[in-house]
Amino acid sequence: MRFKGLDLNLLVALDAVMTARNLTAAARKINLSQPAMSAAIARLRTYFRDELFTMRGRELVPTPGAEALAGPVREALLHIQLSIISRDALDPAQSSRRFRVILSDFMTIVFFRRIVDRMAQEAPAVRFELLPFSDEPDDLLRRGEVDFLILPELFMSSAHPKATLFDESLVCVGCRANKQLSRQLTFEQYISMGHVTAKFGRALRPNLEEWFLLEHGLRRRIEVVVQGFSLIPPLLLDTSRIGTMPLRLARHFEKRMPLRIIQPPLPLPTFTEALQWPSFHNTDPASIWMRRILLEEASNMASGDQEPPTRRRC
C-alpha cells in the first residue's frame, strides 16, 4: 500500500530497525530475509533523502532524521494495531494476551501475586512479563514496549493517564535477636547503626528514605546497597544492621523470618503506588479489562490489608 509515494510496509521495517539497532535482528523480528531488509532501508533512505542509520561496530546508530521519524512511526503503527487489528471484543477466558509490566519487587510480592492467582482462575492463558524498574519508564510507555507501570506516583510523568492504587508507609526492620533494638528506635541509634538500603535501576536511583535524608542534610552509615527491597531482610539476620522498607513488605517478611518492625524515629514520607498506561491504550479492550482487575485488587487489598494465603509447598 502506498501513501504519497511511500510504501507503508517500509514503516514497519523502519520501526523494527529502530528497536533492534541491528539489521539481522530486525529482519528476523518481522519475518524478512536480510537482503529484503537491506533493500527496504535503501528505499527508505531514497524516499526521506537521509542516511537514517550509520554503522558503529555491530550497531546501527540512527541519524537525527531517523530519531525524528521514530516516535511518529511507532505511534502510527500502534494506533493501527489497536484500532483495527485488536478491536474485537475481549473474552478473558480465551485470551492469550501478554502484558508487560514494570514494577518493583515490593509490588510483585505484596500486590501482583493477587493478580496472577486471579488470572489462573479467570483467564488461564493470559501471560505476564514482569520487568524491573527502568531509568526511562515514560519512554517505554510512549514506544508501546510496556503495557503498565506500577510505581510510586512521583516517578510517573503527566504524559500518560494514571490511577491511584493505594498509599504506603515506610518502617524500619531489624533482626529480632538484635539486642540494640527495642520497640522504640532513637534518632541516635538510627544514624549510628549500619544500614542495608535499596536503590533502583541501572543508575541506582535512591529510594524515598534516601531522598528525605538528603533533603534534610542527614547522613547514616550505609553498609550494604541492594537492588530491591526484598533483598534487605536476609542481610539483617544475625546482625546489628537495620533497613527501611514498605510496611506491607515488612509484614510479609516478619511472618517468614525472625524480624522486628520498628517505627522510624523521623517523619519519613508516605507514598502512593499508582498504575499508568500508554494513552493510546485508553480504548484497548484488553487494557481496559486488566486495569479494572488491577484497581479491584488494589481496593480489596487496601480494605482487607491482608496478603493472600500462603501456598503449600510443592
UniProtKB/Swiss-Prot annotation:
Residues 23-42 bind DNA. Residues 6-63 form the HTH lysR-type domain. The keyword Transcription applies. InterPro entries: LysR-type_TF, LysR_subst-bd, NodD_PBP2, Tscrpt_reg_HTH_LysR, WH-like_DNA-bd_sf, WH_DNA-bd_sf. GO terms for molecular function: DNA binding; DNA-binding transcription factor activity. One of its GO terms (biological process) is regulation of DNA-templated transcription. Keywords: Activator, DNA-binding, Nodulation, Repressor, Transcription, Transcription regulation. NodD regulates the expression of the nodABCFE genes which encode other nodulation proteins. NodD is also a negative regulator of its own expression. Binds flavonoids as inducers. PANTHER family: HTH-TYPE TRANSCRIPTIONAL REGULATOR LEUO, HTH-TYPE TRANSCRIPTIONAL REGULATOR LEUO-RELATED. Belongs to the LysR transcriptional regulatory family. This is Nodulation protein D 1. The lineage of its organism: Bacteria, Pseudomonadati, Pseudomonadota, Alphaproteobacteria, Hyphomicrobiales.
